[in-house]
Amino acid sequence: MVREVSASGRSVVVGVLRNRREAIVSACARHRVARLEVFGSALRDDFTSEESDVDLLVEFEPMQPYARVEAYFGLLDELRHLLNREVDLVMVGAIKNPYIARDIERTKQLFYAA
């Protein structure tokens, strides 16, 4: 679960995620998500509730490539609607820069696991 913090706008994201948890979990199940994790500014002091997007790392259950494309964009649309803000949805394995991948791996927080 995403940790709660009281300082800065990060608590806004935690609150929005918590308030929409049931709907987000339903969307994850519908789109065959294996894991959904939060990373980036939503977990740092530089998050601003007015401008920052929410960075999410997603791993889908095994499926055919075309089905994965549909699942990805379907989930992305639902998350943007549910969170009422921009969402950067990054698939596990898509980050090729080892420094960025290591930073995401080090800081990510689990939100959903099937």
Q: Predicted regions: what is each one?
A:
Residues 1-37, 43-50, 61-114:
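Catalytic core of pol beta-like nucleotidyltransferases
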Residues 55-58:
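Short, aliphatic-rich beta-strand segments
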